[in-house]
């Protein structure tokens, strides 16, 4: 099968130069291998068509495209390159991961919008990349079809199986999709595309393959089966282990970036807020018992149940009674916005620094649903893979500093929020019961901070007392759950 590009017309009396490009067949695949042959006179092949003048162009052209860092949103103008998933010379397809970048709010994976070959990386690891500037150069491969005076030709029969398109139509598909069809011996002309303008997508190939052959697609990943919880052991006092020094040697200077840069902005803004502090202790004896009863049930559902879901739900119930604590103020403190959703943030310590993802809509979630979301956020936070959506939109914050150590803290408000709580370590301490007898109690201290410009001390105290009552008597939460 051949397509001819006639560079000049010729007369039957005088031969002119003709350049011919052949499409050679390799197995079941058409591979474009240009072979330029010069003839004087008529070409040595015959057109299987009654018309004499056939002008067709088929050419593969490579183009270097500067792949620029697009706007990530949230006013982010610069990011830090944390990891490259490609190197120069690698072949990429659309939606393949190019690199991972980190802003002062979240880590984002950048994906390719082109099929082609990576020609240049503009940044090294830990370099600062700017929105709108080139990230990589990609040499694209686009089949450029320009037809003049197109005349349909009869289909050419081959002994070998070939992928031929419907006459007069062009099948839209990326090279990756064509490769998938080729590997599974599928004619693209028989597949109905679901993409724009009938473009054939990868899903269309997989669906076609499943219908034709009954192929079983790879199963979706199942929930990881957690090992049975270990039996509780006698509590022993841990012996401090001295670790080798983290840093020795000469002084060095490095720029503040990533989450540390976000902390600079947030804490500088928080310094302008007059903080009101309030501390109290909470007896969690009954909650500790309840959690031990619910842990096996949560484990059967694949959920790791900590105390935090109870703390968040109790806080949400309290915010329903004191909505001023779930509000925000503008920069000049002229307007108060009361938030309908309780998006409660959790201060999380990671290798990348302090991050505060939030659980969305705590007011409509159950304890188990909150625990499931916390498990997800903690897993992504440890891997540095939290999305921007996980980190924005917070309305109230709890900091579980007690998981590391400490009894009291002085939490700093995260603008534009107006309140935050810090939770201390749960300790077994002697306390008096209602009969005046000394008994063992599970005590946790809590420290609150509120924006004293719009929140008075009495409001914080009443909120804390209500939150405390829910945790000291977990059954009370059932009365107010909706």
Swiss-Prot record:
Residue numbers binding CoA: 291, 306, 349, 378, 399-400, 403, 424, 426
Swiss-Prot/TrEMBL keywords: Acetylation, Acyltransferase, Lipoyl, Mitochondrion, Phosphoprotein, Transferase, Transit peptide
Transit peptide: 1-61
Single Gene Ontology MF annotation: acetyltransferase activity
Enzyme Commission code(s) on record: 2.3.1.168
Cofactor(s), by name: (R)-lipoate
Record flagged with keyword Kinase: no
Domain of life according to the entry: Eukaryota
Region Disordered: start-end pairs: 146-171, 218-238
Record field: catalytic activity: N(6)-[(R)-dihydrolipoyl]-L-lysyl-[protein] + 2-methylpropanoyl-CoA = N(6)-[(R)-S(8)-2-methylpropanoyldihydrolipoyl]-L-lysyl-[protein] + CoA
PROSITE patterns, per the entry: BIOTINYL_LIPOYL, LIPOYL, PSBD
N6-succinyllysine: residues bearing it: 133, 196, 261, 289, 440
Family: Belongs to the 2-oxoacid dehydrogenase family.
Protein's UniProt name: Lipoamide acyltransferase component of branched-chain alpha-keto acid dehydrogenase complex, mitochondrial
Source species of the chain: Bos taurus (Bovine)
Gene assigned in the entry: DBT
């Amino acid at each position: 099968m051949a397509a001819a590009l006639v560079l000049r017309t010729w007369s039957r009396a005088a031969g002119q130069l003709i350049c011919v490009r052949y499409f050679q067949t390799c197995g079941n695949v058409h591979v474009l291998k240009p072979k330029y042959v010069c003839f004087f006179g008529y070409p040595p092949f015959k057109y299987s068509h009654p018309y004499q003048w056939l002008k067709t162009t088929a050419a593969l052209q490579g183009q270097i495209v500067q792949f620029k860092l697009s706007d990530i949103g949230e006013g982010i103008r610069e990011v830090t390159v944390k990891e490259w998933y490609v190197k120069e010379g690698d072949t990429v397809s659309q939606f393949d991961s190019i690199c991972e970048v980190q802003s002062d709010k979240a880590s984002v994976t950048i994906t390719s919008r082109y099929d082609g070959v990576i020609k240049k990386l503009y940044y090294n690891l830990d370099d600062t990349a700017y929105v709108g500037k080139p990230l990589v150069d990609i040499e694209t491969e686009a089949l450029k079809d320009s037809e003049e005076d197109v005349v349909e030709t009869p289909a050419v029969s081959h002994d070998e199986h070939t992928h031929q398109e419907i006459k007069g139509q062009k099948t839209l598909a990326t090279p990756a999709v064509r490769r998938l069809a080729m590997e599974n011996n599928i004619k693209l002309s028989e597949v109905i595309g679901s993409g724009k303008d009938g473009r054939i997508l990868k899903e269309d190939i997989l669906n076609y393959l499943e219908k034709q052959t009954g192929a079983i697609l790879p199963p979706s990943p199942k929930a990881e089966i957690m090992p049975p919880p270990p039996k509780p052991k006698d509590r022993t006092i841990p012996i401090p282990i001295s670790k080798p020094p983290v840093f020795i040697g000469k002084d060095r200077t490095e720029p503040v970036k990533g989450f540390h840069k976000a902390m600079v902005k947030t804490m500088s803004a928080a310094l302008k807020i007059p903080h009101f502090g309030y501390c109290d202790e909470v007896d969690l004896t009954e909650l500790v018992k309840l959690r031990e009863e619910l842990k096996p049930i949560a484990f059967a559902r694949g959920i790791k149940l900590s105390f935090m879901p109870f703390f968040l739900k109790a806080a949400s119930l309290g915010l329903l009674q004191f909505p001023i604590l779930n509000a925000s103020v503008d920069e000049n403190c002229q307007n108060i916005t009361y938030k309908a959703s309780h998006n409660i943030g959790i201060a999380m310590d990671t290798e990348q620094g302090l991050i505060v993802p939030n659980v969305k809509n705590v007011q409509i979630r159950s304890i188990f649903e909150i625990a499931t979301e916390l498990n997800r956020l903690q897993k992504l936070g440890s891997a540095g893979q939290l999305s921007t959506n996980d980190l924005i939109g917070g309305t109230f914050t709890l900091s579980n500093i007690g998981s590391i150590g400490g009894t009291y803290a002085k939490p700093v408000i995260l603008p534009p929020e107006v309140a935050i709580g810090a939770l201390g370590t749960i300790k077994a301490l002697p306390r008096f019961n209602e009969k005046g007898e000394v008994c063992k109690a599970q005590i946790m201290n809590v420290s609150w901070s509120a924006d004293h410009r719009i929140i008075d001390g009495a409001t914080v105290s009443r909120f804390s007392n209500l939150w405390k009552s829910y945790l000291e008597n977990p059954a009370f939460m059932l009365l107010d759950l909706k």
